[in-house]
């Protein structure tokens, strides 16, 4: 079945189905803004609305399409792989799992010998926080006001109230704490309690509007983490 230029699939029908079954808030917001885009054809760094309008995609889904939409090399690799393999089984090792893990860890500094796979950035953050808690046997997590690390279980708890409150993901009092960007004193005030498992920071806070950290701030946070036995998580997902 072809989805592009299919006369049986109309933009109006897709919008109705989206309102009825997918994300009514987001869909309605774009309709209200007179920007009810329904992505159809996509190639490289462009995509087309179902009504034929062509757009330059400078958002690239938050970096997902950094090699462009439907990159031919990626499509070829996926197609070739699917002729022999599928996702496998999470209980057993597999050829591609082992080969990819080896390749990833070969790019890391000495001592980083293992790779864990996840399906999204939020899952990766969850795994990082769980690993930090396991390694330090501490529970508290410090993040930056205005940050966004995902919408999964632990990742959403690091974010602003508008993300976590609707899902009752605030955690216990003091479990997830936010401090102001570039305020090393506020950061140290939390870390010196010596009960913080990890500090998680985006090098560039995209959802916050890309404020630039002060020179030396990130390095200063890393030094404070080392001083007080806290792990530093750089969220580059």
Task: Name the predicted role of every residue range.
Residues 102-198:
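PLP-dependent aspartate aminotransferase-fold enzymes
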Residues 2-43:
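Active-site-adjacent loop/helix segments that line or gate small-molecule/cofactor pockets in enzymes
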Residues 55-58, 116-118, 143, 201, ...:
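General beta-strand structural signal in soluble alpha/beta enzymes
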Residues 195-210:
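Short acidic, glycine-rich surface-loop motifs adjacent to enzyme active sites
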Residues 36-57:
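Active-site and channel-lining beta-strand-loop segments
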Residues 2-4, 11, 54-138:
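Glycine-rich loop-to-alpha-helix module at the N-terminal edge of alpha/beta enzyme cores
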Residues 18, 52, 78, 104, ...:
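Buried hydrophobic positions in well-ordered alpha/beta secondary-structure cores of metabolic enzymes
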Residues 211-237:
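Catalytic PLP-binding core of fold-type I/II PLP enzymes
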């Amino acid at each position: 079945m072809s989805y592009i230029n299919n006369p049986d699939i109309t933009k109006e029908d897709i919008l109705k189905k989206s309102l009825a079954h997918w994300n009514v808030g987001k869909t309605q917001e774009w309709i209200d803004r007179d920007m009810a885009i329904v992505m159809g054809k996509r190639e490289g760094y462009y995509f087309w609305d179902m009504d034929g309008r062509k757009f330059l995609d400078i958002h690239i889904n938050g970096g997902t399409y950094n090699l462009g939409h439907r990159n031919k090399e990626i499509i070829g690799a996926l197609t070739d792989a699917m002729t022999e393999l599928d996702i496998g089984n999470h209980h057993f090792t597999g050829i591609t799992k082992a080969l990819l893990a080896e390749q990833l860890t070969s790019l890391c500094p000495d001592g980083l010998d293992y790779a864990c796979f996840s399906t999204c950035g939020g899952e990766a953050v969850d795994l990082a926080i769980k690993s930090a808690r396991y390694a330090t046997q501490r529970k508290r997590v410090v993040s930056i006001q205005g940050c966004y690390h995902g919408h999964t279980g632990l990742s959403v708890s690091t974010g602003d109230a508008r993300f976590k409150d609707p899902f009752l993901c605030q955690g216990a009092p003091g479990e997830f704490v936010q401090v102001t960007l570039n305020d090393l004193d506020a950061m140290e005030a939390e870390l010196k309690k010596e009960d913080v498992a990890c500090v998680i920071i985006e090098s560039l806070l995209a959802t916050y509007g890309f404020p630039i950290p002060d020179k030396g701030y990130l390095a200063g946070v890393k030094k404070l983490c080392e001083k007080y036995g806290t792990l530093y998580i750089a969220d580059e997902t």
